[in-house]
A protein has these predicted regions:
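Preference for long, amphipathic alpha-helical scaffolds in soluble/luminal domains
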Residues: 1-671
């Protein structure tokens, strides 16, 4: 169908078009007002109550009494408590999460809340209904061990000697995902030192252990040959360590861990750009005798006050699990470009592109362990995380630079950045044709069997959504399906398509996100969009549209297949669905697109943005192997509450994705 035919189908909706124009104008005004003077955007990143609870526990471990943020963090925790007494992993979850609830419970008791306080009692009653504290994950046990409420002997042993392992060894730290690796190293110090800063008698958690503690805390043996092997290996290692109070090489191993940590502190004071390695590194340094006044410690704590925390009404304070200024700036710039902005007509876009170019990482990182001869050239997700650039941000950076290049005054600078980014991306392609997030071929399933790995995801295999974003960038830069890397990536994407036509979303919720990543990528490569597998995907999208014209999908879809593409409509997921259909054939799907346009127009706030309490970003689906695998559901100890998962509400998703969709729809109409 020719573009002219598509426009004809859309032209009768003149009043809607005028309304949509004002919707876009208001949204653009809001976005431009949200830009920082330096040229970037940074929306709040909401996650779950473990963030605030763990910081309160960390203050206790570090010996920081009455931290200025403590009262606000406590208020934030109380605001999030569910009616049944629990705390959940994401907004709208069907049930609370045992791990989050126990950690919050411990944090509130640590802050002086009595065991008979109504909120504490409600939480405790809920915990006991779930089977008690014995149900918690390994990471929660680590926290309880740090405050003297769980024996270190009954946590998985994390020997610092793992840093001695050569690169070819299956348990070399560089086989773990970047986020797991950066967390594992400081935990090795804490595990080796058996660090304990006990709660006072009034705050101890004896009420959570109504039965004999020894029966509650015993490390559970999991099913499966490898899991059994690691269980017995852990027992043997602990016996060995009891025999040798100072195992040979232990001090040298701890020193290596310490040096590893110190070399990787970010410029803003955090570690790894995310909360877990940051908070565990601070405690590991404390275990090694670093006072909180030491420059490294002071810098790490200062970041918390500087820009990682945010406030909400009622005196509540929260801490972000991560910051996303690079990601937010890339996608905000993408939205401006989709709305017809250029670097010559818009100083805001020009400043954003300047800032993006400045963020390219040209320093070595952990990824070079597998690619020692490859030059840097990627972009990171966070504010100051030069050690861990990622493929997804790099792909979107190349998309933005490719679109902005014609009107950017320094073409040579853009060309050099694109060349460096492309070389890095091609080198990062995995053997199966896809791309992971932070490393090449980070897919050793064996690592998921060790007792430490009962949280989120331990490895970082190739994913469809990241691969699709790379292909979209390559298409914009002139690559086509005949290029070997593109052809191999397309094979991977085709192999991952679900039987009903959609694709799984590793980094966004969920099948709507995965499908919305793939279809624009295929269009970017100038593929024939009438192919059966493509139309099947588009028809799946159409079939999931809600009666209000929008689309939504619950985080529960990661564990409940009946929730695929189902959920209350959200602005971001509606935009993803729209961009999917626009990539395939805007004319054929005009009715769905116009209903979606009306949904966005009628739900826009007077300020020009959209409300979106639902979480549409994904950190960890919780399968433990970095990819979709519902066959493991029984062994996961996870249901729709996603107790192993980590879900995210990117506060700017609700804004720049609708702008992209509306901008592309306007371009199709010729308005």
């Amino acid at each position: 169908m020719e573009i002219q035919d598509e426009v004809d189908l859309l032209e009768p909706q003149e009043s809607l078009t005028a309304s949509a124009d004002s919707t876009v104008d208001r949204a653009l005004s809001w976005l431009l007002d949200a830009q920082y003077q330096d040229g970037y955007w940074a929306g709040t990143l909401e996650s779950n109550a473990c963030m605030e609870a763990e910081w309160l526990l960390c203050f206790h471990v570090l010996g920081i009494a009455n931290h200025p943020m403590s009262r606000g963090l406590v208020q934030g925790l109380l605001q999030r408590q569910r009616a049944d007494g629990s705390w959940d992993v994401y907004y709208g979850a069907r049930a609370g999460d045992i791990n989050t609830t126990v950690e919050v419970y411990a944090a509130l008791r640590c802050q002086g809340y009595a065991a008979d306080h109504p909120d504490i009692k409600r939480a405790r009653d809920w915990i006991q209904l779930q089977g008690g504290v014995k149900q918690v994950r390994v990471f929660t046990r680590f926290w309880l061990a740090l405050i003297g409420e769980w024996p270190w002997e009954e946590t998985p042993n994390l020997p610092p000697e793992i840093l001695f392992f050569p690169r070819w060894f299956p348990f070399n730290i560089y086989h773990f995902a970047a986020w797991a690796r950066a967390t594992l190293v400081p935990l090795c110090i804490l595990s080796a030192r058996r660090m304990v800063v006990s709660l006072n008698k009034k705050s101890c958690l004896q009420e959570l252990f109504p039965e004999d503690r020894s029966a509650v805390v015993a490390l559970r043996k999991k099913n499966g040959a490898w899991s059994a092997f690691f269980y017995h290996a852990d027992r043997a290692l602990k016996k060995y360590q009891r025999m040798f109070k100072r195992p040979p090489g232990r001090q040298q191993a701890i020193k290596m861990c310490l040096e590893w940590i110190l070399r990787r502190q970010d410029a803003d004071g955090a570690w790894g750009g995310i909360q877990p390695p940051w908070i565990y590194s601070l405690m590991a340094l404390k275990a090694e005798g670093y006072p909180v006044t030491h420059p490294v410690m002071a810098k790490g704590l200062a970041a918390l006050d500087a820009h990682w925390s945010y406030e909400r009404p009622g005196g509540a304070q929260f801490v972000q699990a991560c910051e996303s200024p690079v990601w937010d700036t890339l996608l905000s710039s993408f939205a401006l470009l989709d709305c017809g902005f250029s670097c010559t007509s818009s100083s805001a876009l020009r400043r954003a592109v300047d800032w993006i170019l400045d963020q390219q990482v040209l320093l070595p990182g952990d990824w070079q362990q597998k690619l020692p001869t490859v030059s840097p050239g990627g972009w990171a997700f966070e504010r100051a995380n030069v050690h861990y650039p990622d493929v997804d941000d790099t792909a979107v950076a190349l998309i933005v630079l490719a679109k902005a290049r014609p009107d950017y005054p320094d073409t040579a600078r853009v060309n050099l950045a694109i060349e460096r980014g492309l070389n890095w991306l091609f080198a990062m392609q995995c053997r199966n044709g896809g791309w992971g997030a932070f490393d090449k071929d980070n897919d050793k399933d064996l690592l998921t069997k060790i007792p430490f790995s009962d949280f989120g995801e331990t490895i970082d295999p190739a994913s469809v959504d990241v691969t699709a974003h790379v292909l979209e960038a390559l298409g914009l830069l002139g690559y086509r399906t005949t290029h070997p890397a593109v052809a191999k990536a397309l094979e991977f994407i085709r192999s991952e398509q679900e039987s009903d036509g959609c694709w799984f979303g590793r980094w966004g919720v969920n099948y709507i996100y995965g499908t919305a990543a793939v279809l624009p990528a295929l269009a970017s490569l100038n593929m024939n969009m009438n192919q059966e597998f493509i139309r099947r995907a588009a028809n799946w999208i159409v079939g999931k549209q809600n009666n209000d014209g929008g689309w939504g999908e619950s985080c529960a879809s990661y564990m409940d297949d009946t929730q695929r593409g189902r959920g209350p409509s959200t602005a971001s997921q509606t935009a993803w669905a729209m961009m999917s259909l626009l990539a395939v054939d805007g004319g054929t799907y005009a009715e769905s697109l116009l209903r979606a346009e009306a949904y966005l127009e009628t739900t826009q706030t007077p300020e020009g943005t959209w409300d979106e309490p639902y979480y549409t970003g994904t950190g960890f689906p919780g399968y433990g192997i970095g990819r979709r695998e519902l066959k493991r559901q029984r062994s996961l100890q996870q249901h729709a509450e996603l107790s192993r998962g980590f879900m995210i509400n990117y506060n700017l998703y609700r804004h720049y994705f609708p702008l992209m969709a509306l901008g592309r729809l306007a371009a199709l109409k010729g308005t």
